Amino acid sequence: MIDVGDLRKGDMIVYQNEMYRVIEANKHFMGRGSGLIRTRLKSVITGLIKEVSFSSGEKVEEADISFRKAQYLYNDGDHYYFMLLDTYEQYSLPAQELEDEKFYLTENLEVDLIFFNGNPVSIQLPTVVVLTVIDTEPNFKGNTVSGGGKPATLETGLKTTVPFFVERGQKIKVDTRTGDYLERA
C-alpha cells in the first residue's frame, strides 16, 4: 500500500480493482482540516481518464508490475516498437499509451518496459535524454546568458525553452520529468 500523498506522475496503482497510471497528482490543503489530493488516473486497460480526489492519509494499492530493459526501435504512427535487451523479443505499445513519453524517444534509446500480468503497459524513461535542436531563433547582439531563454523545437517535436547561446543543430540534455533544458551535450 502506498500513501496517496506520495503519488507522483507515472506511478501505477490499483483503484477499484483496475490498474491506473497517475497522470497528475496535486495536493490541496485547507486552512484547518486535512488536505486533499486530486488525481487524474488513466486506465491501463481501457485508456479512459478518471479524476479522483483522496483525503490525505488514505492509502491505495501499488500495482504489481515488473520492469525489463528494452531498446526503442521505431514507430509506425499507431504503435511504438521496443526490443528486450536480454531475449531480443519485440513488443509494441499503442501511441495513446505514450502521452508525454513519445517526445523523448529517439532510435536505440534504452528504456524500462513496464509489464503487468505479462503484458507491456508503459515505459519508464531515463531521467535525462540527449536531443537535437531543429528549430530556434538565431542569436542577436545583446542577448545575455542570464537574460532568460528562447523557444526551441527538438527532433522529436518537443517544444522547450533554451538559453540564447543554443543554436540550431546542437545537441542538448533534457530532463524527461519536466521537459526542461539542462545543459549542452
From Swiss-Prot:
Pfam families: EFP (PF01132), EFP_N (PF08207), Elong-fact-P_C (PF09285). Involved in peptide bond synthesis. Stimulates efficient translation and peptide-bond synthesis on native or reconstituted 70S ribosomes in vitro. Probably functions indirectly by altering the affinity of the ribosome for aminoacyl-tRNA, thus increasing their reactivity as acceptors for peptidyl transferase. HAMAP family: EF_P. SMART domains: EFP, Elong-fact-P_C. The gene is efp. InterPro entries: Elong-fact-P_C, NA-bd_OB-fold, Rib_uL2_dom2, Transl_elong_fac_P/YeiP, Transl_elong_KOW-like, Transl_elong_P/YeiP_cen, Transl_elong_P/YeiP_CS, Transl_elongation_fac_P. One of its GO terms (biological process) is peptide biosynthetic process. Belongs to the elongation factor P family. One of its GO terms (cellular component) is cytoplasm. Keywords: Cytoplasm, Elongation factor, Protein biosynthesis. Its main location: cytoplasm. This is Elongation factor P. GO terms for molecular function: translation elongation factor activity. NCBIfam families: efp, PRK00529.1. It is found in: Cytoplasm. The keyword Isomerase does not apply. Pathway: Protein biosynthesis; polypeptide chain elongation.
